[in-house]
Amino acid sequence: MALEPSSKRGVYEGKRYTDELKNEGQKLSKRHRGRFDPMNEAPYELSRGRVENYLKCKACFWLEQIHKVKPPEIPSFTLNTTTDILLKRDADAVRGRSTLPLWEKAGLGHMIPWQHDHLENWANSLHYGLNDTYFNTVHDETNIKFGGGIDDVFLNTKTNQLHIVDYKSQAQGTRSPIKYEVKPSSLNDPWKIGYKRQMDMYIWVARRKGFNVSGTGYFVYVDAQHKN
């Protein structure tokens, strides 16, 4: 294998790469995000988290979106991030081909990780509003671009419908090591209403993108055991 010497072709390739970066920069500059600008005609980007902020505290939402006054941020837990990475890695190993033991055990052997060219973009929560290949939709009536980053999508091989999947981490075990019990996972806790709204929004976005999406989403809980 030989290295190609520097040539006019190399200069051309470098220029083309520079032009691509320039074009990408122009696209980014046209995006309407962060502080709301009434003079900007581009769709205003609102993530699922921002919508949740509006529902919890309209004054806080107004301060952040109009005056860029952000509330104190809670650092993310490394355990949660690691859980997502490992579960997605397992799904990628059989994506588009077969199910996973966890799903088989739950009686959902007909569910397989969905394969799609844009799935990696759909998982990108930082750049969800970049273009149509990312997980977003424009609500024409308000000129708002709603979106976010999803964890995964599974295909129901019986119905040919898609199901949005969200990965969660928790520790439901009791504190006492003597009489240790693990509480059953539930979505009925008051603070988990945001999980349900998140799922509803992601199903809505996916349907507006033209996909046959089921109204049933799945939450995959990883429960940390601290018995010993």
Please identify what each model-predicted range represents:
Residues A2-Q161:
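Metal-dependent nuclease catalytic cores that hydrolyze phosphodiester bonds in DNA/RNA
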Residues Y128-N228:
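Mg2+/Mn2+-dependent nuclease catalytic core
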